[in-house]
Amino acid sequence: MPRQPQPAPFDGALVINKPQGKTSHDIVDAVRHLAGFRQIGHLGTLDPLATGVLVLLLGKATRLVRFYTGRRKRYTAGFRFGFATNTYDSEGVAQGPDVAPVLDRGVIERLAAESVGPFEQTPPIFSAKKVHGRPAYELARKNEVVELKPAPVEVFEYRLTGMEGAMARFSIECSSGTYIRSLAHDMGQKIGCGAHLAEITRTAVGEFSLEQAMEIEELAAAARKGKFQSRLIPLESLLPNLPRANVLPILEKRVRHGGKFNVTVAQLQPGHMELPPGATTQLEPEGAHAPRLRVFSQQNKLIAIAEAVVPRTYQPIVVFDPLP
């Protein structure tokens, strides 16, 4: 008989402060080595140039990835004016000579303000967007023609925080899928001197912030002391914006079989958000009429995520440790 896969020994989330020069895959590989298992996913990659928040989900928590779709992101970013690059960041090839720009704070603030709101953004050709099944950057490296369709994005905050020489720094909150590189390139085009992204730190993904993030070296030190699990955000603490209900053992059995179940008003507890400093402003606790629910046992173990089919009747859509 084929060997059955062993369950992951740890379930929960890690917030890593990714260093510059490392790929997101490098960090995932490092955590897999420290944890001793491969069941690890993430909530969005970072380019090697970028530093900051990389959220990893481990074990059973990987089944929650879809519920984080659309979480807003926050960044601090430095735009270097004077020339554009083919990748829109400092790792690309300069497109023209480096001119000494004369930057006007008022103009930059106006252009940033004009980009707040929803709009269509064309991704950089040096991106992982697929073209006929292949990443666009593969085609761009071969100097093949790359045509990418604009995608809807939204910028919620785009605030100038400082200027020094040819560099301007910003605080940005945006929808998932927004390219900060493109914001830098577009501003340079509008000013007429060219610009590219010189530095960037992701400071938040939804409710996860840089305040919570640890260096990979910190995690390695904890693992050497046998305290890897102590650095996890527990499975039961994830998706805190969703309401919860603790069910009795007889109902727990039904839930773990995947059957519909009813919840009384008295059982429902609204979502409870205690956002760390720097988290995005998007999330609000959801009440009794929320379309989804976290289901807990009497021992406060998360056993399922369920979806409302009619008021106060729910269908499990993710079941942890299901019964046959």
Set out the residue ranges of the language-model regions:
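Accessory RNA 3′-end/elbow-binding domains used by RNA modification enzymes
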Residues: 1-42, 46, 50, 106, ...
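RNA pseudouridine synthases
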Residues: 1-214, 304-306
